């Protein structure tokens, strides 16, 4: 069974994110940032939908810039689930994920700690790096908000075990941050 790839590589002309090979895709969001707005399904919906089946793959063929963005989101969802393991309810989970989204400890492509630097083109200039940081921060904030809605069917209860069971899995045998690093 092949991995699920992003439909945005074939359906949409994907804008490059600065001078890198990641895609700058439109998203549905209320958070401020450089991402174009849309009212339709976006890369975040796709990443959340394909997270569970794709997390089991050790290899993933990148077919375009939208796939690179989706890979980053899958890595980030895993970090979010690790954070949610300690959350007693939805409000605490939202606070934890908002703090994680704004964290400067999360590496971006081109930095030393990023796990797939060989497959991602680093930003060539400071404006490209700033645009990438702002875009990734915006999608991290949005994915945290949507993941809380999915992981907490009851806002007063702990997160769903059907999401938390994936917190220990490692996509492509890698993680966004090294093992043992607490965010």
UniProtKB/Swiss-Prot annotation:
Q: Major place of localization?
A: cytoplasm
Annotated GO CC locations: Arp2/3 protein complex; cytoplasm; striated muscle dense body
InterPro entries linked to this entry: ARPC3, ARPC3_sf
Gene Ontology BP terms? Arp2/3 complex-mediated actin nucleation; epithelial cell migration; morphogenesis of embryonic epithelium; regulation of actin filament polymerization
Which UniProt keywords are present, listed alphabetically? Actin-binding, Cytoplasm, Cytoskeleton
Q: Where in the cell is it found?
A: Cytoplasm, Cytoskeleton
Q: What does this protein do?
A: Functions as a component of the Arp2/3 complex which is involved in regulation of actin polymerization and together with an activating nucleation-promoting factor (NPF) mediates the formation of branched actin networks.
Quaternary structure?
A: Component of the Arp2/3 complex.
Family statement drawn from the similarity comment of this UniProt entry: Belongs to the ARPC3 family.
This one is known as: Probable actin-related protein 2/3 complex subunit 3
Q: Which organism is it from?
A: Caenorhabditis elegans
Q: Which gene encodes it?
A: arx-5
């Amino acid at each position: 069974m092949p991995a699920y790839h992003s439909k945005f590589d074939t359906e949409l002309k994907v804008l490059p994110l600065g001078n890198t090979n990641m895609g700058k895709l439109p998203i549905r969001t209320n958070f401020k940032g450089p991402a174009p707005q849309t009212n339709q399904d976006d890369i975040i919906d796709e990443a959340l939908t394909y997270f569970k089946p794709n997390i089991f793959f050790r290899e993933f063929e990148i077919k375009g810039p939208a796939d690179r963005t989706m890979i980053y989101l899958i890595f980030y969802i895993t970090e979010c689930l690790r954070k949610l393991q300690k959350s007693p309810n939805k409000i605490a989970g939202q606070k934890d994920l908002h703090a994680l989204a704004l964290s400067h400890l999360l590496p971006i492509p081109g930095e030393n700690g990023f796990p797939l630097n060989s497959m991602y083109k680093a930003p060539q200039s400071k404006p490209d790096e700033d645009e990438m940081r702002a875009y990734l921060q915006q999608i991290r904030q949005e994915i945290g908000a949507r993941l809380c809605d999915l992981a907490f069917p009851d806002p007063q209860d702990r997160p769903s075990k059907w999401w938390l069971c994936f917190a220990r899995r490692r996509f492509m045998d890698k993680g966004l941050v090294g093992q043992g690093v607490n965010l």
